[in-house]
Every structure is written in C-alpha cells, then in structure tokens.
A protein has these predicted regions:
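An acidic, glycine-rich surface segment that forms the CoA-thioester-binding/catalytic face
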Residues: 1-15, 52, 57-60, 64
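Secondary-structure transition/capping motifs at alpha-helix termini
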Residues: 4-6, 34-38, 64, 68
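Gly/Pro- and small hydrophobic-enriched strand-loop and loop-to-helix capping segments
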Residues: 29-54, 91-104
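Active-site cavity-forming subdomains of large catalytic enzyme subunits
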Residues: 9-12, 19, 32-33, 37
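Short glycine/serine/threonine-rich phosphate/pyrophosphate-binding segments
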Residues: 19-27, 54
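Glycine-rich beta-to-alpha transition loops that act as phosphate-gripper elements at the mouths
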Residues: 13-19, 73-79
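Amphipathic alpha-helical segments at domain termini/boundaries
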Residues: 24-28, 74-180
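Short helix- or helix-capping micro-motifs
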Residues: 61, 69-75
Length: 181
C-alpha cells in the first residue's frame, strides 16, 4: 500500500519471472510493462502450493482485468507470457526485450502527457458494460463466482482447497474498498 500511496506514478518493468509476490508488487504500481522475452512469465501460482495470493493479488488483479479473467489466472495458477498479459490487460505495454531500455523510456515519456495517460486508462476500461455484467454489482459477482465454483469442482472434485479459498476471498471482498479486502 505504500507503493500505491507514493505522490508520483510508478512503473514496474517485467523481464523474466514475475510470479506470486513479484506480480503482487507489480500490481501495486501505476503502470506495468513486460518484455517479449521468452522467459517472461507472469502469474499467481500460489494455489499450486496450497496457499492463496496474500499480498493483494486477489484484490488488485480482479479490479484491473475483471473478475472472470482474474479468476482464470488465480484459480489455475498458470502463468502467462508478456504478450498474453498485455492481451488480458495485466500489463499496459509489451516491448521487445532487445530494445527494452529505449521502449521503456519512450513509454515513460508517453504517459507523462495527459493524452498518454488517458489512452492507457481508456484501454483499461474499454469494456465497462461487460465489467458491470460480471463484477460491478453484487448479483453479478455472485453469479460469476458460482460459475467459477462449479467449473472448479468439476476440475478438482473438491480435492484442492486453495483454489476454493481463493475464490471465496475474491467473492467476499471484491465489492469492498481495497484496504478492507
């Protein structure tokens, strides 16, 4: 939360493994950039270890990319590459690894302008109706969580409690302020 409270924007640059707490730290930044490096891997694999994301991942990821996509990432624990993370909305840009320094500086200059910041926000909020249908009201969250629970039970037969607990945490806290969740 200290990172979020800084009086200036922050940028997380992801070039390699960004899993678990690393992604949760990146999610606390204002902007995220990933490289197209084949070793770039972004995800929350905690459920594969029998635990749930504990440093804000269950709160920040659904707010950023929407509940259905976040549930898919969190409940499976499977990481994605930089391009897929961009497509999902986890990162704001994906840059070639060999030109990362130049492209990151270019992105920083871009978001200094009001037009650049607005373009990033428009991309993040490009589907407000879909977000409302799946997460921005209590009934939508309940329906989305019930569908996810049904799919999870089919897949795991209830033998893996961590994904079920992660789902429960998200379902109970997503409508609350970030600090309360």
């Amino acid at each position: 939360d200290r990172l979020v409270a800084l009086p200036f924007p922050t940028i997380a640059v992801i070039d390699g493994a960004c899993l678990g707490g690393g992604l949760e730290l990146a999610l606390a930044c204002t902007y995220r950039i990933a490289t197209d490096n084949p070793k770039t891997s972004i995800g929350l694999p905690e459920v594969n270890l029998g635990i749930i994301p504990g440093f804000g991942g269950t709160q920040r990821l659904p707010r950023l990319i929407g509940m259905p996509k976040a549930l898919s990432m969190i409940l499976s624990g499977k990481p994605v590459n930089g391009r897929k993370a961009f497509k999902l909305g986890v990162v704001d840009a994906v840059v070639p690894a060999e030109f990362a320094t130049e492209k990151i500086a270019e992105f920083a200059g871009y978001i200094k302008s009001a037009a650049g910041r607005k373009a990033v926000l428009v991309r993040r909020n490009s589907r407000p109706f879909r977000r409302w249908l799946t997460q921005d009201n209590a009934l939508a969250r309940l329906v989305t969580a019930n569908i996810a629970c049904r799919n999870l039970m089919k897949k795991t037969k209830g033998c893996y409690p961590a994904p079920l607990k992660a789902l429960e945490v998200i379902r109970r806290t997503l409508g609350m302020p970030l600090a309360a969740g």
